[in-house]
UniProtKB/Swiss-Prot annotation:
Assigned GO CC terms: host cell plasma membrane; membrane; viral envelope; virion membrane
Cytoplasmic membrane side: 457-515
Protein name in UniProt: Envelope glycoprotein
Biological-process GO terms, alphabetical: fusion of virus membrane with host plasma membrane; symbiont entry into host cell; virion attachment to host cell
Residue segments, region Immunosuppression: 365-381
Stretches that traverse the bilayer: 436-456
Site-annotated residues for Cleavage: R301, S302
Length: 515
């Protein structure tokens, strides 16, 4: 007899239901949506004369973006404030972090290698070959600063570094992953102004960050002035940088407006009492959701509520497990019933085959006896020795009796270990036990829903209300630029020097300030 095989069904994975319930409860937490804004202000500019005006990006995501950028895969990293005599862009570590016992400036020499005016042309991949003629220092073309930002998140400030030079920089902000090769502009045909206007700067940044809101701080002073001496430097090669510059704050009395704005209409280069001033805005990327959110407050919950929630969760998980077990048992019972019907048909077919084999064997035996008697009557031996065959009749083996004995009822072969929570009989019939199981399962499930339904309704309602409150609403305003007569534009003795610094008229239509 072959050994009886038992098929065991594992208990329902309660961990799966726990994870599902915790996922539903996690929906009560508000999802953080990142909205970045480009704001213009003067928070990062230094007021001292002849000093280095640095900028910082105080966020760890920038360092991660640098490490993941394809342009910085093999770039060296420096720990000095200057390399080859020129200051580099640096990312100071977060507050409180120290390296080797002292606070260190971590600098990176990534593409491009000269993100400021003043670098040597052989070190600058953006140097224009068309500017090899004898030109003044104001003919320096624009530089492109690539910042590989993974995502707009956190609060950080972005301006540029100034160390005795006028920072005529055109920004090109990109989010990683970047293309394999940077798309450098072709400057062989037309002159590209170093700084068109703040409107062009906003437009370029808007294209680089399509998923970020653009706004600015409507509070004076709007931008600092950069003092430029009215002189040029001639050389046999291309101009390397503007002359030495000084940085100071905008004179609020000179640039006072009723709206708190200072809008250069046609030019960014003005003539003030101290000399020629170039107006450039500092830039900052601010996360609106983080900046506008209130500081987190700790909510104390009573132990009774925690116990009630834990008890409700336990009862609910038990009810779900019992309900699933009852449904599984019902399906297994139906499957066993169908298989037993098929088994009964198979047993009937085996019995019929057994009877047919018995009849065939009886007929074969009768035929052999008749042939043997006939051959002996004629004076021969029996049939097989006469035809010289040791076995001239078919020997029929009938094993259907053994096979039929192995076919036990399927309900007796299947183990019922999966019914471990309800492994009781009480002398009841099967349908009564199934009814009790189903009623208890439905009762526990209803009890679980009664405990959890108020929490789910409250959480979903609060979530929808919060999403409605956080919907961005920007009032439309129209800013009219001040006429050119309000500012004395610089008219140098050599107009060709400043010809490429005359920006186009910026677009003031449909500008949206921060809420």
């Amino acid at each position: 007899m072959p050994k009886e095989r038992r098929s065991r069904r594992r208990p329902q994975p309660i961990i799966r239901w726990v994870s599902l319930t915790l996922t539903l409860l996690a929906l009560c937490r508000p999802i953080q949506t990142w909205r970045c804004s480009l704001s213009l202000g003067n928070q990062q500019w230094m007021t001292a004369y002849n000093q280095e005006a640095k900028f910082s990006i105080s966020i760890d995501q920038i360092l991660e973006a640098h490490n993941q950028s394809p342009f910085c895969a093999k770039s060296p990293r420096y720990t000095l404030d200057s390399v080859n005599g020129y200051p580099k862009i640096y990312w100071p570590p977060p507050q409180g972090r120290r390296r080797f016992g002292a606070r260190a400036m971590v600098t990176y020499d990534c593409e491009p290698r000269c993100p400021y005016v003043g670098a040597d042309r052989f070190d600058c991949p953006h140097w224009d070959n068309a500017s090899q003629a004898d030109q003044g220092s104001f003919y320096v073309n624009h530089q492109i600063l690539f910042l590989h930002l993974k995502q707009c998140h956190g609060i950080f400030t972005l301006t540029w570094e100034i160390w005795g030079y006028d920072p005529l920089i055109t920004f090109s902000l990109h989010k990683i992953p970047d293309p394999p090769q940077p798309d450098f502009p072709q400057l062989n045909s037309d002159w590209v102004p170093s700084v068109r206007s703040w409107a062009l700067l906003l437009n370029q940044t808007a294209r680089a960050f399509p998923d970020c809101a653009i706004c600015w701080e409507p509070s004076p002073p709007w931008a600092p002035e950069i003092l430029v001496y009215n002189k040029t430097i001639s050389s046999s090669g291309p101009g390397l940088a503007l002359p030495d510059a000084q940085i100071f704050w905008v004179n609020s009395s000179s640039f006072n407006t009723t709206q708190g704005w200072h809008h250069p209409s046609q030019r960014l280069l003005f003539n003030v009492s101290q000399g020629n001033a170039l107006l450039l805005p500092p830039i900052s990327l601010v996360n609106l959701s983080t900046a506008s959110s209130a500081p987190p407050t700790r909510v104390r919950r009573s132990p009774v509520a925690a116990l009630t929630l834990g008890l409700a969760l336990s009862v609910g998980l038990t009810g779900i497990n019992v309900a699933v077990s009852a449904l599984s048992h019902q399906r297994l019972t139906s499957l066993i019933h169908v298989l037993e019907q098929d088994q009964q048909r198979l047993i009937t077919a085996i019995n019929q085959t057994h009877y047919n084999l018995l009849n065939v064997a009886s007929v074969v035996a009768q035929n052999r006896r008749g042939l043997d008697w006939l051959y002996i009557r004629l004076g021969f031996q029996s049939l097989c020795p006469t035809i010289n065959e040791p076995c001239c009749f078919l020997r029929i083996q009938n094993d259907s009796i053994i096979l039929r004995g192995d076919l036990q009822p399927l309900s007796q072969r299947v183990s019922t270990d999966w019914q471990w929570p309800w492994n009781w009989d009480l002398g009841l019939t099967a349908w009564v036990r199934e009814t009790i199981h189903s009623v208890l399962s439905l009762f526990l499930l209803a009890l679980f829903l009664l405990f959890l339904a108020p929490c789910l309704i409250k959480c979903l309602t609060s979530r929808l209300l919060k999403l409605l409150r956080q919907a961005p609403h920007f009032p439309e305003i129209s800013l009219t630029p001040k006429p050119d007569s309000d500012y004395q534009a610089l008219l140098p003795s050599a107009p060709e020097i400043y010809s490429h610094l005359s920006p186009v008229k910026p677009d003031y239509i449909n500008l949206r300030p921060c809420p």
